[in-house]
C-alpha cells in the first residue's frame, strides 16, 4: 500500500498493468499511467477503482472473485459465535444449531457461508436475483424470491452484496424491521450498503436486534448506546488471512498475463 496518492501516481507513470488491493485507483491515478492497459483488483470488490475513468481511457478493469471467499465466510461465523455467546463474558448465550440464516447474495462468499452454516446445523436460505432457483438449490440453499421474504423468515442475515449505486443504503429500516425477534445482521460486505441512520433507529426501537460487521460504521459512536448488541472489527478484516492475501494477488498476475497475451477478460467489470 502506498502512503499517499502522490506516491502511487509516481509509481504508475510507466506501467502497462496494475494490481491493487486497498489503494484507490482514482481518475488521477489512471490518467497518470500513460501506458496502462489493464488493472486488476486483488479481491472481489472493486469500488476503489474509477471504472468510468478506465473505460474512458480504454483500460480493462478486472477483479479476482472467489479468492478470499473462505476467509470472509470464516470471519462471519467467528463473529456470529462471539455474539451468540455474549462476547465470552461467562453468561449463557445460545447455539446456532437449528437457527435460520438468510444469505443475501449467494456468490462465492455466500456459498461458503452456506457450507459452514450447514456444518453448524443451521437452515440455509438464500436470495440472489442473478441466480435461478435451481442454481441456488444446487449450491445447497433454499431459494427465496424476495429480500423481504427472506428477512421476515430468518434469525440471521449475512450480507454479501456489492456496493453499487443500486445497493447503497438498500439495507434499510423497512427491510430490517421484518426480521424476527432476536434478529442478527451480519455485514462482511461493504458499510455503504447499510442505511446507517435507519439501522440506528431500528436498534433504538428494538432492544432485541443485534448488528455485527467487519468494518466500523461512519458514526460508530452512535452505537455505544447499544452495549452488548453490536460488534465491529477495528479495520476491514474479512480477507485478512495469509492465504487470502496471497491468492488474489497470484490470480491477478495470471489475469494480466492472460489479457496481455490473449486478450482474456473473463472478469472484466467495466464496459
Sequence positions of predicted segments:
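NAD(P)-binding Rossmann-fold cofactor-contacting core
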Residues: 2-3, 119-138
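Phosphate/diphosphate ligand-binding glycine-rich loop within oxidoreductases
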Residues: 16-93, 195
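Phosphate-coordination loops involved in phosphoryl transfer and adenosine-cofactor binding
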Residues: 36, 97-101, 173, 182
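Residues forming the Rossmann-fold NAD(P)(H) cofactor-binding site
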Residues: 48, 111-112, 173
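Rossmann-like dinucleotide-binding domain for NAD(H)/NADP(H)
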Residues: 61, 75, 173, 181-271
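Oxidoreductase and adenylate-handling cofactor-binding alpha/beta cores
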Residues: 73-89, 118-122, 250-264
Amino acid at each position: 500500500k502506498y502512503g499517499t496518492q502522490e506516491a502511487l501516481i509516481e509509481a504508475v507513470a510507466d506501467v502497462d498493468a496494475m494490481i491493487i488491493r486497498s489503494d484507490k485507483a482514482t481518475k488521477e491515478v489512471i490518467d497518470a499511467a500513460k501506458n496502462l492497459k489493464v488493472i486488476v483488483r486483488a479481491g472481489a470488490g472493486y469500488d476503489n477503482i474509477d471504472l468510468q475513468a478506465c473505460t474512458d481511457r480504454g483500460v480493462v478493469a478486472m477483479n479476482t472473485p472467489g479468492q478470499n471467499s473462505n476467509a470472509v465466510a470464516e470471519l462471519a461465523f467467528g463473529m456470529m459465535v462471539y455474539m451468540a455467546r455474549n462476547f465470552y463474558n461467562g453468561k449463557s448465550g445460545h447455539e446456532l444449531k437449528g437457527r435460520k440464516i438468510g444469505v443475501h447474495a449467494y456468490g462465492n462468499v455466500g456459498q461458503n457461508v452456506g457450507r459452514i452454516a450447514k456444518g453448524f446445523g443451521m437452515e440455509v436460505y438464500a436470495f440472489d436475483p442473478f441466480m435461478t432457483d435451481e442454481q441456488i438449490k444446487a449450491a445447497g440453499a433454499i431459494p427465496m424470491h424476495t429480500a423481504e421474504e427472506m428477512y421476515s423468515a430468518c434469525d440471521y442475515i449475512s450480507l454479501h452484496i456489492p456496493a453499487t449505486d443500486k445497493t447503497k443504503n438498500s439495507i434499510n429500516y423497512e427491510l430490517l424491521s421484518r426480521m424476527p425477534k432476536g434478529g442478527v445482521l451480519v455485514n462482511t460486505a461493504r458499510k455503504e450498503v447499510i442505511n446507517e441512520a435507519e439501522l440506528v433507529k431500528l436498534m433504538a426501537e428494538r432492544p432485541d436486534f443485534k448488528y455485527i460487521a467487519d468494518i466500523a460504521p461512519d458514526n460508530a459512536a452512535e452505537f455505544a448506546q447499544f452495549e452488548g448488541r453490536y460488534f465491529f472489527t477495528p479495520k476491514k478484516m474479512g480477507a485478512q488471512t495469509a492465504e487470502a492475501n496471497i491468492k488474489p494477488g497470484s490470480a491477478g498476475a495470471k489475469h494480466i498475463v492472460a489479457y496481455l497475451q490473449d486478450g482474456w477478460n473473463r472478469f472484466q467489470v467495466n464496459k
